[in-house]
Amino acid sequence: MTSPKIIVTRSQPGADQTLRALKDRQLEAVLSPALTLSRSDAAVPDLSRYGGIVFTSANGVRFLSDETDARDLPAWCVGPATASAALLEGYSPVHQSSGDGSDLSHYIAHHWPSGTDRRLLHVANAAARGNVKTALEAEGFEVDFLPLYEASTAPALANAAYRLISTGDPSLVLVHSAKGARAFLDLCDGLDLSALSYVAISEQAAGPLREDGQKNIAIAPHPDEAHLLETLDDLLSRI
């Protein structure tokens, strides 16, 4: 039986990385990023005031790296993709936690070097929740939030994705965030989505899908790209 086609809704440049991973698996996929990322108007503060930078996405790493050449502050990253982006940009040292922002906060609190300035800068999407800031402040850190980039709904579905959904053929949609899931549903307004199944990076990311009544949602056991793709592999093996 032919594997269903896969729709990648992740924003760029990460979407291209996901597409390459799918091609390595000899899977047919179409790109249709549900979100467009852009620089916000937030000013970057003097980084010398901080004892470290908290990154909860690879995009945060990329946007900050475009703004400053400073790389000497410890980078505290959620997940391997964010840590890899920080290493590629030359940050040192780079610390990596597994899980989500709450796990990262716990990791920082338990691995923070004694005697080091406990003031942190959290770089993220303007719509990011304040969970990281709240959790770290409860552990005695002083945290400034820098909403360095914004994510807005893409103008439309990619033509290939629109045609694929319109055919009614079974297809799989990869979902990397709750905001991306909500944007994808908005872009699909008026389309019959009954033939779609979903693989979401986390239960939080799947939230808008469940609220919309979507069915056939598989959740990665850990919120990172590797486990998302493993969940996809497992799902395809049972089709």
Language-model regions: role of each:
Residues 1-239:
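Signature of uroporphyrinogen-III synthase
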